[in-house]
């Protein structure tokens, strides 16, 4: 596994001076726009993006619509053809001091998320996919659970939105790390959504961040590694993320994905269960491929 490198962020783009593009060695303060006073963020909403400027703007605006003052947004542009700052400029967000943007050559989602982790200053990392949005009460719900439980890792229910429907997807809760680990490896549908996860930054850093040796299933590997270290994510039974289903977020690389699953099962499953789990995973991936082939 390639370790998380806290002092090796590669920031190469030449950008307008008024845009905050930060190396980890030069952090800036977040300013409360109402009082113009510095605020140390509690939450760093981390977004990795490539070539989704319009969706990125929607994601960022959803964060600000929560009204939370102790939040920063860290955006890592992972080699977009059109730099993300152009979309931010068009949306009037270019000089917003709550946004911290790093543009870097394309190195993949794991490296982009590690860059965001290195730049972030909040106590908690809230992961947000660039095509997802937070609900207006997201931080109210997250704060309530974090204060009540002291949990270092939270996953949540979410809203799934299509052109014709909208529904809340309820996630299961688990009593122990081994129970959740088995579910992650065998359930046809993942028992968590990475977007919306909120993780104590120190815990995520101590785990080594994201595994840059993996190209896909990066979120799954991270959760499995946490579970192996006896960290049990706690479920928040409220949807805090709006997930808009569209063609570009449906995986069509089932064979590649199946190979990644085999590797994860070999790494994290008990030896006596590996063949059975691989059979379960093969059947579920073939079934999902069939659903994708005939259309949703």
What is the role of each PLM region?
Residues 1-28, 266-296:
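Membrane-proximal basic amphipathic "stem/tether" segments
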Residues 155, 198-200, 204-210, 262-267, ...:
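Short secondary-structure transition/capping segments
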Residues 2-255:
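Nucleotide-sugar donor-binding/catalytic module of glycosyltransferases
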Residues 239, 243-246, 252-276:
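Catalytic core of nucleotide-sugar-dependent glycosyltransferases
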